[in-house]
Swiss-Prot record:
Protein name from the UniProt record: Cytochrome c oxidase subunit NDUFA4
Biological classification of the source: Eukaryota, Metazoa, Chordata, Craniata, Vertebrata
Record PANTHER family: CYTOCHROME C OXIDASE SUBUNIT NDUFA4, NADH-UBIQUINONE OXIDOREDUCTASE MLRQ SUBUNIT
Functional note: Component of the cytochrome c oxidase, the last enzyme in the mitochondrial electron transport chain which drives oxidative phosphorylation. The respiratory chain contains 3 multisubunit complexes succinate dehydrogenase (complex II, CII), ubiquinol-cytochrome c oxidoreductase (cytochrome b-c1 complex, complex III, CIII) and cytochrome c oxidase (complex IV, CIV), that cooperate to transfer electrons derived from NADH and succinate to molecular oxygen, creating an electrochemical gradient over the inner membrane that drives transmembrane transport and the ATP synthase.
The species this protein was found in: Bos taurus
Record Pfam families: B12D
GO CC, alphabetical: mitochondrial inner membrane; respiratory chain complex IV
Length: 82
């Protein structure tokens, strides 16, 4: 398959940016899904030792990818301990 892509790129050089952007988009999507699977507190890989990982988060833990106007270092805890 890689040989076909290289052959098409040699025959039609205008396809090179298309291949670059499709490759970058696929790589970015794969990295984002990997980040969600490994670092998101909603995902539990070990149900016996840590069945509810979201309960161990403190109020200062930022697990969002990007936060516009919330400063997580200044938040106070509002809920009860579990």
């Amino acid at each position: 398959m890689l040989r076909q892509i290289i052959g098409q790129a040699k025959r039609h050089p205008s396809l090179i940016p298309l291949f670059i952007f499709i490759g970058a988009g696929g790589t970015g999507a794969a990295l984002y899904v990997t980040r969600l699977a490994l670092f998101n507190p909603d995902v539990s890989w070990d149900r016996k030792n840590n069945p509810e990982p979201w309960n161990k988060l403190g109020p200062n833990d930022q697990y969002k990818f990007y936060s516009v106007n919330v400063d997580y270092s200044k938040l106070k805890k509002e809920g009860p301990d579990f």
